[in-house]
Amino acid sequence: NEGAILAARAGRTEITMADLEEASEKVQMGPERKSKVVPEDEKRMVAYHEVGHGIVGYVIGGGDRVHKITMIPRGPAGGYTLSLPEEEKSFHSKKYMLDRIARYFGGRAAEEIIFGKDNITSGASNDIQVATGMAQQMVTKLGMSEKFGPVLLDGTREGDMFQSKYY
């Protein structure tokens, strides 16, 4: 357990909530990159970007609450916004998924509002990748498209009884 390792390294025999939080973030996002020197303009950009995610999450509300916003680099990220679900669910509504996509674009929107269209950065690349993947899943596998309706569009037909081809 990563939390126990952190407590032991600190010379403690009990695991604290801070140990568990740090362990969870380390596993999810990677270790803190404390030695990374971040220029002031980049810190400012990261701060606005992450707060953009937080603001969209706060305004949208819904099932995930903003738990933490940080500019401390971890893994490949310059900072991150951690949202936690209020309850665990096996299935997600279309609204929930669209809200999550909006949250992913909150960082890019903040960059554009604060710094202008010509000064947006590559910092949103992972956000765009994840949001695009979610949107593709919604349309091609989950039948959540207004245009196509409840159909499977990814080319597989696992449910075909006779595996016949459709021409």
Identify the residue ranges that each predicted region occupies.
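Hydrophobic alpha-helical transmembrane segments of multi-pass inner membrane proteins, especially
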Residues: 6-9, 26-33
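Residues within well-ordered alpha-helical secondary structure of globular protein domains
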Residues: 2, 26-29, 57, 137
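Inter-lobe coupling/hinge segments of SF2-like helicase ATPases
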Residues: 12-14
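Soluble catalytic regions of large protease machineries
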Residues: 43-48, 54-167
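C-terminal helical "lid" of AAA+/P-loop NTPase domains
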Residues: 1-9, 21-22
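Structural motif detector for alpha-helix initiation sites
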Residues: 16-17, 94
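Short pre-active-site segment immediately N-terminal to the catalytic Zn-binding motif
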Residues: 35-45
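Short, conserved phosphate-binding/catalytic loop or strand-edge motifs used
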Residues: 21-26, 75-77
